[in-house]
Amino acid sequence: MPELPEVKTVILHLKKLILDKTISKIEIFIPKMIKEISSEEFKKYLENETIFNIENEGKFIVFFLSNNKIMLSHLRMEGGYNFYSKKRQKEIHDRLIFHFTDGSSLHYHDSRMFGTFHFRNSENYLKIKPLSLVAPVPWKIDLDEFFKLLKRKKTAIKKILLDQQIIAGLGNIYVDETLFASKVHPEFKANQLSLEQVKLILKNATRILQESTKLGGSSIRSYTSLNEKEGSFQNFLQVHTKFNKPCPNCGELIQKIKLGGRGTYFCKKCQQLN
């Protein structure tokens, strides 16, 4: 699943290729991916509009268009974009195609079809679900308020860090890496963390997300950025995907468990539960 660094990398490439382009036609092959309105309404609202900016809110890609229109895109598990400067045939996993007036096109591909698209107006898009539910990213979180919130949670800290309504941008990869850097066991109860531990978790989450963004994200399993470009942060992962390999700090073999349905990697010596 693309996490915050991967989403930001996609946006960086999109900005270089499609800003100031006008949508002439939208082809929608999987209507269920368009939420709240029909696919025909979606096309009517966005065709003939110009894309002038692209940003993110958590893991959502936010396309700002002319006439105060906004399109939200969430890549979910397998979503991604390919840009073509000339006419290109539909590929097997292409689900939407945005054609531009200059003959270029942007293809959204998604083998599992979990991705979503939403239409919004700019004056209220942050106040309506799903964006109204998206929490701040780690570097924008108030430490004291976050600590108070965790004191009310008896859940494993990994599950908390994966909750986009509590803290945005972290997925399975970066939660494992953050907790390893913070020497906190993924099953450690959130309400038992000290203020210093919480501060360290936010600090490491910020550092790791920003370092990964600079390297184009982590290309493991199916993730590639725009037009199949790979990131390189996977070369610097300390524990995630490192089952039975030596811990880079102590040499103990990295463990793997299932936590909340997610494969979870940690060092039992560096990240002690008791």
From Swiss-Prot:
SMART domains: Fapy_DNA_glyco, H2TH. Binds 1 zinc ion per subunit. DNA binds at residues 93, 112, 153. Its EC number is 3.2.2.23, 4.2.99.18. It catalyses: Hydrolysis of DNA containing ring-opened 7-methylguanine residues, releasing 2,6-diamino-4-hydroxy-5-(N-methyl)formamidopyrimidine; 2'-deoxyribonucleotide-(2'-deoxyribose 5'-phosphate)-2'-deoxyribonucleotide-DNA = a 3'-end 2'-deoxyribonucleotide-(2,3-dehydro-2,3-deoxyribose 5'-phosphate)-DNA + a 5'-end 5'-phospho-2'-deoxyribonucleoside-DNA + H(+). Its cofactor is Zn(2+). Involved in base excision repair of DNA damaged by oxidation or by mutagenic agents. Acts as a DNA glycosylase that recognizes and removes damaged bases. Has a preference for oxidized purines, such as 7,8-dihydro-8-oxoguanine (8-oxoG). Has AP (apurinic/apyrimidinic) lyase activity and introduces nicks in the DNA strand. Cleaves the DNA backbone by beta-delta elimination to generate a single-strand break at the site of the removed base with both 3'- and 5'-phosphates. Belongs to the FPG family. This is Formamidopyrimidine-DNA glycosylase. It comes from Mycoplasma mobile (strain ATCC 43663 / 163K / NCTC 11711) (Mesomycoplasma mobile).
